[in-house]
Amino acid sequence: MSDRPVLEPDSAPVVSEAVGPPHEPGTVLRARYRLTHVVGRGGMGNVYRAEDLRLPGRLCAIKEVTPEPHLSPELRRQANQQFLQEASILAQLDHPNLPKVSDFFSDDSRDYLVMDFVPGHDLRELLQASHARGEKLDERMVLDWAIQIIDALSYLHRQSPPVVHRDIKPGNIKLTPDGRIKLVDFGLVKLLAQDDARTITVVQGRGTALYTPLEQYGGDSGHTDARTDIYALGATFYHLLTDFPPPDAKTRFLNPRALRPPRGLNTNISPHVAEAILWAMEMHPDDRPQSVAEFADVLFGHHARAHPARPATLASALRENRTAALLALGLFLLAVVLTLL
């Protein structure tokens, strides 16, 4: 195996067939927001940079959410209600490391979330620039970022009901020109107190493969919680500090040795930092830190990891994770079919 990392994008979600062509530059939404250009394109819609015509000089980021075209009118109505409920919660959030949500609305079967435009570069771009120079990101710098990211996640998870981001990755973390970290892209945020999993699936999407734990596969939203974010956070720090993208959870499920020890890829990583990363990336949620505060204690060297993980066996994983069992069966059958062709 080569010791050079294979540079990959954040493995962005597959763009849904519902996502049509973006609005033309100059389009005005809600008689207030003039779109300048597309700054991102995700699984459920586009993200635009816009000028606020009511407050000259203010720039906004507008997240577009488009429901699947085959949905019944009733499911479309539920999807819109879910969006409005989530957006109203997000608009109440106020934290220095989160962009402020200032408005939300629906127009022509699409929902829009308006938030502050965050200038600067995302951590994926900084990682790629460091790689191009033949360098690795400095651990002290990454831990400085970690302080701010963890503070934002702690704030989200303390809400009532708790708010889980569900798509933490280097590309969704921005560093502003004044050195502040912003956790962006609320497109996959999920509130834990929901009754209709179908609506959640319609609105949310499914995260990003390299940073997504096994319980999040298949849109099984009822089994995700704060520990889902902790896995993604650990995977993000793994990538930032090793310069190697982590193997996705499906690969790790079939091959537990696929995840290489962080210090084997970068000897400058402190032992306690490597320990925290591997703890956060445990396959079973019960084996991970149960809060970001627990994760932070080990990451910053305040405490050692309390308990070792249970022995990881395929049989135990199958018994405890129905989604994983179905996934493993599907992969096995696919391998058999390909062998026979």
Label for each model-derived stretch:
Residues 46:
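Conserved N-lobe ATP-binding subsite of Hanks-type protein kinase domains
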Residues 51-60:
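Conserved N-lobe loop of protein kinases adjacent to the ATP-binding glycine-rich P-loop
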Residues 66-92:
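AlphaC helix of the eukaryotic protein kinase fold
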Residues 104:
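Activation-segment/catalytic-loop signature of the eukaryotic protein kinase fold
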Residues 108-122, 126:
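Conserved short submotifs of the Hanks-type protein kinase catalytic core
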Residues 145-146:
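Activation segment signature within eukaryotic-like protein kinase domains
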Residues 150-163:
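Protein kinase catalytic-loop region centered on the HRD/HxD motif
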Residues 210-306:
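C-terminal lobe helix-coil module of Hanks-type protein kinase domains
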